[in-house]
């Protein structure tokens, strides 16, 4: 690996300090650190644009929490570059490597001794009339939800063109297995092992209590048509990118062509991470 991209929380002093040390460590090994220009200015360095990074990097290191990693994954998803997540945040389902483990993990990666978890992504589009007005890749989830003062949302749903139901709810979450421990979990959705290939539809506070989460095959295409008029409704992707929806908009969600490749610790298994992060067995 000759070039490694570094992503971090821009205004976090701790991330800035760790990034500076990491840059020095990489340069001592004749590896070119690629830092996005805005963050690079905080480090007193020159950088590259975020659009250039996917074509230049052989690997990426993310310093922060899951939100920072998810943002990097959407940027890099089209290239399937391995991403090493270092947890400097709080929960850290995806950034499972600790700061103490950073340099041993990097040494292992440079030596080719690392394990990669291939994570399914989603492609979400919004159609308005005959036009596609919004298109994005998603690692965790695509969420349709109402604004603070909006009433219940009516959404017609189809799977592979077949009518499923018309949801009356505060919103709807369409998630990947990776996203099952995110918003989906808070809405009483199932925890899905990240190695599985599937989509999950989870209603948010449905008006009908028999509307339960549904797990679909990975090849399924979920189509949602917004029926509600004059309501404040939004589509949010990974909790970071979104747009306001209008009555009649059609949202299509399907498996994306590319995946996110996460570098995982060989010393930890998924169930250990799950047990630790969710504090199972504690009183």
UniProtKB/Swiss-Prot annotation:
The keyword Electron transport does not apply. Transmembrane segments: none annotated. Pfam families: NAD_kinase, NAD_kinase_C. It is an enzyme of class 2 (transferase). Its cofactor is a divalent metal cation. One of its GO terms (cellular component) is cytoplasm. The keyword ATP-binding applies. One of its GO terms (biological process) is NADP biosynthetic process. The active site is at 66 (proton acceptor). This is NAD kinase. It comes from Geobacter metallireducens (strain ATCC 53774 / DSM 7210 / GS-15). Keywords: ATP-binding, Cytoplasm, Kinase, NAD, NADP, Nucleotide-binding, Transferase. Belongs to the NAD kinase family.
